[in-house]
Amino acid sequence: MNLDNLNSLIELFFYQSDKQNKKSIFLQWLNPNKQITYTWGETQKSILKLSKTIKKNIKEGDRCLLVSENRPEWFISDLAIMLSGGITVPAYTTYTEEDYKYLIEDCEPSLVIVSNNEMLRKLSNTINQKNFIKKVITLDEVNKVLDNQDSVNKEKYLDFNTLLKIDLLEEDKFQNNKLKRTSPACIIYTSGTGGNPKGVVLSHGGILNNLVGACEIMKPLFNSRPVFLTWLPLSHSYEHCVQFAQIAVGAKVFYAEKIEKLLENISEAKPTIMTAVPRFYQNLYNKININLKKQTGFKAKLIDATLRLGKKKLLNQKMSFSEKLLNLIVNQLVRKKIKKQFGGNLKAFVSGGGALDKEIGEFMNSIGLPTLQGYGLTETSPVVSCNPIHKIKVETVGPPFKGNQVKIAEDGEILVKGENVMLGYWNKKEETQKVIIDGWLHTGDIGEIDSEDGYLKITDRKKDIIISAGGDNISPAKIENMITNEPEIDQCMVYGDKKNYLVALIVPSKDFLKEKEKINNVIEKINKKLTLLEKIKRIQLIKENFSIENGLMTPTMKVKRKKVTEKYKDQLENLY
């Protein structure tokens, strides 16, 4: 299959599903209350049946809002919308009623697909007010909410499972040849770390272009049918693209029940490959590290050898005969056991959605969990570059994908050009023109390109850089990573724009909530590794975690600096 020759993501799906065994399981939800599985054949039929209804209720180019947790029906809905000539607008389930109102008023969907009662409650008021919404398809029974609707509004609602019971006629089995590589596939709203989200319009060709690079990365990782465990929100561009990579490689896909059950789900699914964001690896690093540090005697020596030799191998440093022998021993006694905790079949983690700390990257790779750091943003469909398994450089985000042009502007900003670049921001022509100049997308990230092998390195986010009172540029991300790598500290945010020194908001780990002296000692230890300008002079401990629920983190677990600063402005200013 040559991805460059395909016109649409729909063409990709039908090409792959026609090749697969129709009875082979393709999609499976690991929810004990809803044991849902779809074979390749059932998935194809379900997409065609759902599309039959959608086509009657939308025109070509109409937007369709999709609000659901990760589950097989998410996949089916997304493909059915595109097959019908619609544009999928995925939305996070963590949004508030106001967030949904903003999205609906901005993209004006003709159709809404929503998962359950809980999510529909947040949408129903806006749905009832908007005449442009023709139909609402519910994945689960939602009688509780519908009981309060008048008869006119009740007619808007259709049940997903009922729609799948309709008969397919020969003319319903079509593949929509009108779609082109330049056709919009989806509008993904950037969660953003401040301000209203912007709708990023991505094309079929942009995502297909991304898949060429993704398949190159995955090719050396497996020689049989790969298994994926999907747990990051499918409404995020990162996991949304992974969904199409799963089609391209003919994978078996498991959907995690929920984040709290992730480790159990990993044991059950035994994934070959997993995608995650830096916060996941940081939590993993702290948990594994705490357990490793408890070991004494011979076990402690084995762990030390695992980390030391793993790092040597990662850096392609020469090993003596005795080191090679010891490395084989720790492979069996240490790395194999760690790998078993992740199902035993894991070939690689792929990290994206933010910068992965170098120390964590080295640690993960050294203990036998290969971790490939990539880089991208919603506006680039989303991947720009990724480390290949045969040559990992943890301090970088790897070489650019085929078809992506990358250059560094005079001020250090990373610029990207290629088919993967978005078509633009929905309804925001001026905003689009500000970031795409002469075909080059201005990413807002600061970086450099390694002259030796063309690997890209991200040094900071342009808008996050702190400029001190003396005009010096300081990277908060570097300092924050060093602080949160310590087991005593769960989260932090560094502050100090236009100030004489830096301060930090610290959320201690639960075992250290009342241990201010120990936290101070940790900061003192870190300060010894920092330059005079980077040192943290004062700290403020807070008990409440930054979370998606309290609006202080994005759905991919990045701290919303603007919101945190607004909430804790007085405490921060009192540190000066």
PLM regions with names:
Residues 37-41, 185-211:
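Conserved AMP-binding A3 loop
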Residues 26-58, 62-75, 79, 96-101, ...:
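Conserved AMP-binding/adenylate-forming core of the ANL superfamily
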Residues 120-181, 288-337:
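ANL superfamily adenylate-forming
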Residues 25, 157-158, 165-189, 196, ...:
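Conserved pre-ATP/AMP-binding loop-to-beta segment of ANL
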